[in-house]
């Protein structure tokens, strides 16, 4: 029973007893003293245990869980209309921006995914269908298409018109699928040119000419083991980043689609637990792990809308008997003809083959082969943005420069099956991350690059008219507060929408790519100004950011980003505060990017009055292959060393501000693996505590595609196993958190770790989340609360 309850009980007894007249001043004084002591204790507790859900606390701002959503930029997926207006997705639904003013054109209902047709006459609404076992491969949805009629009266306020629509039920809705409202759809794709579409149901692709038309055309013949138009788990997670495996041609008259055979791929089994269900539900899905003998095999087909015929393509690779991943698919105009380009890579992802596919012959002829130098690899990012101009293709390859090599734009002139060597654009020493496209009138190519600094992401242009000189021009550099930019272009590459993610409040600019102002800078203006959002970010009191480059060896530097609560940084007398090292450390990751970063670590640090340190060392991206290659074949080694070295330097440089006796490390997924590895490799008691969420404990337990990309054909003995060296956890407190339904990093990893910690007699904290996957997204509040309580105990209570 609490102290407050005890006090109230006693107080009630005094009021109701027969001896109230016998109370003297001493008794009253004692009661008052007790009450005052309780009030002091409550006040002290409020100061010490900063509430997670209070907006402000005693004069200084504290971030809370709700800020994770309210401070997130509310706009995404921008697209141009025919009259140069801009359509975008927002929390509320689909909005259109005209002359700097936005209005809602289609509202979001119950969090449904909304996809507009090419002319925005129709909107597809996708609501998730029941999935009792929560199987990631069984995710389906109910699909409705709404006829979004033209405005009834342009003079009416939009909200009034929306109310009228609801009352009059003026919008016509169409249920899509073989069984209409009873159908569960696996994937859906509008034609980018017209209002027709395709969808996948029961592993087969179907075509419908318009929402109003009842007739369906079956495009493919998938079944129980052959799946058409969809990617399996490993392709969705590690290569394409999406579920559908369908590509409409630009003209809208052909559809390319991928198919795979899954009956030989091994399954992983997870369990879900439901109230009043006597038995758990088993969830089985295909997940080939490292060293797996069988990987999913994919084929590529084209369906012709005019003839209503499908043809499986004969992909002519030199080593056709070996296993190949499908890496990229894109329709491109080559010499005035639209053709399908497909890119393939070997199992270890260090060789690529590019083919051009023809409908008439049903052949994909080999046009380009490339073998990567030692300790280098290909990713989907290098070819997903492939583009063309006349008879030349442009994509990303490593370009050797002095003592380094950078991912840069390579051009390949096609020669009908005669293999040629690509040439590189004349660029500086920086990594190009993606190609946006080419303005064919001005012969200008646009791309994103990690420049002018490695921690930046900027939009560049480059003139193909004179490739003898470096004509690269940074477009987004002239936009204020835009060190981390993401751009979307119109079809003619004359206008760009640039989403600026930092370093301050995110915002969006619209850029005229064909005109320069008086300072020879590209003309730009705000797409829209969301004053409410801007004020919210400014009032949030985001931490002060310190960025440094520190030496960790003769050949390598580490980039660091130190975040300090603003009220602490501005104090006259600095008192050393705890430090939370937020680590990820995975291949090609950038943790010190100059963007506004507001994650759960910011909320926890705010509640704990601690600083956050992020570090990029060897293995990180943005600084060429010299850094990327360093971890090849040895995950969990040099990147761990660099983190520990950098922490030591930072603690020395900022010893007036950071308390070296109160250092915690926190990481999720690969970061969870890094957290455990760093505690193992650091000096004893270097870390006071550690939080590891959903960690990999040995990459032999992880998926083959990811692991073998970075480990190659290294034997099992070369794999780091964090469970082999756990003695430091006897002096470093550990909080281990994992979802039991994690389909990405299986709980198997934590189970093996738990077993070994118990064998060694290590005391640790454990929090498991039933029915929760890798992100624990529906348990964010609980995760933050548990982490905050754990770290506050570590920093302020434990000795």
Swiss-Prot record:
Its main location: membrane. Belongs to the peptidase S9B family. DPPIV subfamily. Gene3D superfamilies: alpha/beta hydrolase, Dipeptidylpeptidase IV, N-terminal domain. Keywords: Aminopeptidase, Cell membrane, Disulfide bond, Glycoprotein, Hydrolase, Membrane, Protease, Serine protease, Signal-anchor, Transmembrane, Transmembrane helix. Glycans are attached at residues 64, 138, 267, 335, 481, 512. The keyword NAD does not apply. The active site is at 669 (charge relay system), 742 (charge relay system), 774 (charge relay system). GO terms for molecular function: aminopeptidase activity; dipeptidyl-peptidase activity; serine-type peptidase activity. The keyword DNA damage does not apply. Its EC number is 3.4.14.-. Residues 53-799 are lumenal. It comes from Caenorhabditis elegans. Removes N-terminal dipeptides sequentially from polypeptides. Essential for control of distal tip cell migration. This is Dipeptidyl peptidase family member 1. It is an enzyme of class 3 (hydrolase). It comes from the Eukaryota. GO terms for cellular component: plasma membrane. GO terms for biological process: proteolysis.
């Amino acid at each position: 029973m609490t102290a407050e309850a005890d006090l109230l009980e006693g107080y009630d007894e005094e009021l109701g007893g027969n001896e109230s007249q016998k109370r003297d001043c001493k008794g009253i004084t004692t009661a008052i003293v007790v009450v005052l002591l309780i009030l002091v204790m409550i006040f002290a507790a409020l100061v010490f245990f900063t509430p997670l859900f209070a907006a402000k606390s005693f004069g200084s701002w504290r971030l809370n869980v709700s800020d994770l959503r309210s401070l997130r930029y509310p706009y995404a997926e921008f697209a141009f209309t025919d009259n140069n207006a801009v359509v975008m997705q927002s929390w509320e639904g689909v909005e259109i921006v005209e002359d700097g003013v936005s209005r809602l054109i289609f509202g979001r209902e119950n969090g449904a995914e909304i996809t507009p047709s090419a002319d925005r006459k129709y909107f597809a609404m996708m609501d998730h269908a029941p999935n009792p076992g929560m199987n990631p491969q069984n995710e389906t949805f109910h699909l409705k298409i709404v006829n979004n009629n033209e405005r009834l009266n342009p003079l009416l306020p939009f909200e009034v018109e929306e109310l009228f629509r609801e009352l009059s039920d003026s919008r016509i809705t169409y249920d899509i699928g073989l069984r209409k409202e009873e159908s569960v759809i696996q994937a859906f794709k509008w034609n980018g040119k017209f209002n027709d579409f395709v969808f996948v149901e029961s592993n087969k692709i179907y075509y419908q000419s318009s929402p109003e038309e009842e007739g369906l055309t079956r495009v493919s013949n998938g079944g129980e083991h052959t799946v058409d138009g969809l990617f399996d788990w490993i392709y969705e997670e590690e290569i394409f980043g999406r579920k559908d495996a369908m590509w409409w041609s630009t003209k809208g008259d052909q559809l390319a689609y991928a198919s795979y055979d899954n009956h030989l791929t091994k399954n992983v089994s997870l369990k879900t637990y439901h109230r009043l269900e006597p038995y758990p539900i088993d969830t089985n899905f295909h997940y080939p792990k490292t060293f797996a003998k069988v990987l999913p095999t994919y084929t590529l087909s084209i369906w012709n809308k005019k003839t209503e015929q499908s043809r499986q393509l004969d992909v002519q690779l030199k080593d056709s008997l070996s296993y190949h991943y499908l890496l990229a698919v894109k329709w491109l105009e080559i010499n005035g003809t639209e053709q399908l380009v497909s890119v393939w890579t070997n199992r270890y992802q260090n060789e690529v083959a590019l083919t051009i596919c023809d409908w008439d012959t049903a052949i994909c002829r080999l046009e380009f082969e490339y073998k990567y130098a030692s300790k280098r690899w290909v990713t989907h990012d290098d070819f997903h943005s492939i583009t063309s101009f006349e008879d030349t293709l442009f994509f990303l390859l490593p370009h050797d420069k002095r003592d380094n090599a950078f991912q840069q734009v390579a051009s390949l002139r096609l020669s009908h099956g005669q293999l040629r060597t690509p040439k590189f654009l004349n660029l500086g020493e920086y990594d190009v991350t993606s190609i946006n496209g080419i303005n064919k009138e001005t012969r200008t190519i646009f791309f994103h690059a990690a420049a002018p600094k490695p921690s930046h992401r900027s939009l560049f242009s480059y003139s193909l008219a004179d490739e003898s000189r470096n004509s690269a021009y940074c477009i987004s550099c002239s936009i204020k507060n835009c060190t981390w930019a993401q751009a979307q272009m119109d079809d003619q590459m004359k206008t760009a929408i640039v989403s600026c993610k930092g370093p301050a409040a995110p915002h969006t600019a619209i850029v005229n790519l064909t005109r320069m102002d008086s300072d020879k800078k590209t003309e730009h203006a705000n797409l829209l100004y969301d004053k409410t959002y801007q004020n919210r970010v400014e009032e949030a009191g985001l931490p002060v950011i310190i960025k440094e480059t520190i030496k960790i060896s003769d050949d390598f530097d580490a980039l660091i980003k130190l975040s300090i609560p603003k009220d602490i940084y501005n104090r006259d007398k600095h008192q050393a505060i705890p430090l939370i090292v937020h680590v990820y450390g995975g291949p090609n990751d950038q943790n010190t990017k100059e963007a506004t970063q507001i994650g759960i670590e910011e909320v926890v640090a705010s509640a704990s009055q601690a600083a956050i340190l992020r570090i990029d060392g060897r293995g990180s991206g943005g600084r060429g292959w010299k850094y990327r290659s360093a971890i090849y074949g040895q995950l969990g080694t040099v990147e761990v060393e660099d983190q520990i070295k950098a922490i030591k330097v930072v603690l020395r440089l900022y010893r007036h501000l950071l308390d070296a006796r109160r250092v915690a490390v926190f990481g999720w997924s690969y970061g969870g693996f890094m957290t455990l590895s760093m505690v193992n490799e650091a000096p004893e008691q270097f870390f006071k505590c550690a939080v590891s969420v959903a960690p990999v404990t040995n990459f032999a337990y992880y998926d083959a595609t990811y692991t073998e990309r970075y480990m190659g054909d290294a034997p099992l003995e070369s794999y780091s196993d964090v469970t082999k060296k756990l003695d430091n956890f006897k002096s470093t407190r550990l909080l281990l958190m994992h979802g039991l339904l994690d389909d990405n990093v299986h709980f198997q990893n934590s189970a093996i770790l738990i077993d070994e910690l118990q064998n060694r007699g290590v005391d640790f904290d454990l929090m498991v989340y039933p029915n929760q996957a890798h992100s624990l997204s529906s348990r964010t509040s609980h995760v933050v609360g548990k982490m905050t309580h754990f770290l506050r105990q570590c920093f302020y209570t434990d000795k």
